[in-house]
Amino acid sequence: MMKYLKYYIVPLLSTSVFIGIYLGGHWMWLGLVVLFLVVVGGDAVLGEDDSQPEYSYPWLLEIPLHLALPIIILLLLSFAWASGSAGEDFLGIGQLLSGLFSYDFLTARDRNMWFDYLGALFGVGFVVAGVGTNVGHELTHRIKDRIAMLEGRWLLSASCNADFAIEHVYGHHVTIGTIEDPATARKGENVYIFYIRSTVMGHISAWKLELKRLRKKGNHLLSFNNRMITGYMMSALWCGLFFIAGGIFGLILFLGQAAIAKLILEVVNYMEHYGLSRKPEQPVGPEHSWNSTKTMSTLVLFSLTRHSAHHETPRVKFWKLDPYKDAPQMPYGYLTTLIICLIPPLWYKIINPSLNEWEQKNLPA
């Protein structure tokens, strides 16, 4: 049973961000601290996991995926409430909770300082990236499942990622490793330059792909058939909700966490394919993605870490992915590697020996 229950750590981790938001003050850093301790510490203590267990009840693995959207909705509603000024109680949440627990949630919130909100901003941003964007990624690969696609797009709306479900599935998975792929980092490319290039060019690519689809179907550009426009509208609803709850400050908080979540997504893109090049005519293989078999990273990211297998067989559900122990390996777990990427000289020093070895093996002399 533990092989099923272990994936429910994601909803449990998310509760620490909720608790921090409602307790207020320095507690608003709780979620971020817990996340780093559990994920980085878990990877260090638990080591590697290259197992491929058989699952007789796969529906038990689907539940945490479908819990993601309720978690993100409740999290953003909570964060919107936290943005309210003194005397404001968005949706009556503070009064409701104060009636259930012996704690004055409204007074605690009204005492929050800018430093406290900063902690919540990063905590929410990491959950929106790790739960929202990551699960949205898993679900929007299920292109024939309308419910999964709708869930995935709403999850991506929390980070203003209207383009991702289009460009990632129909662009990145086709052009991975080539010069045409915005989401493949080139050798020696600074992560911050990559962030700008991938964000801008990925968005343009999504528009091109969507326009091509609309023309093929005979649909008008300015219609609800345009997934870019409906994606913008989804995120606009979140913007409106935060503005109602907290005015300009609320809107800043929403856009701030979305920017953090987007940065995390692009850094993950950066480290998953850094320097691994491919000719357009060459088939996509396990050698074109950096893998990780770290246990905790694998659990909290629903096997996104088995990225080589994901690109080789993108329609395969997360629990069926091969660990590919012989594929290029990240030096550490995902969260640790992400932080290292933010320090380019350190990243180059750590990754370049492995990349040079990969080039000798995979590139023609």
Segments predicted by a language model, with ranges:
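Cytosolic/stromal cytosol-facing helical appendages immediately following the last transmembrane segment
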Residues: 2-14, 144-228, 249, 254, ...
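Bulky hydrophobic/aromatic packing residues
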Residues: 25, 50-53, 78-79, 318-320
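Intramembrane catalytic core of multi-pass membrane enzymes that act on lipidic substrates
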Residues: 53-196
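A cytosolic-side transmembrane-helix exit/cap motif
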Residues: 47-57, 138-142, 270-281
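Alpha-helical bilayer-embedded segments of polytopic membrane proteins, i.e.
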Residues: 1-46, 59-83, 95-129, 223-266, ...
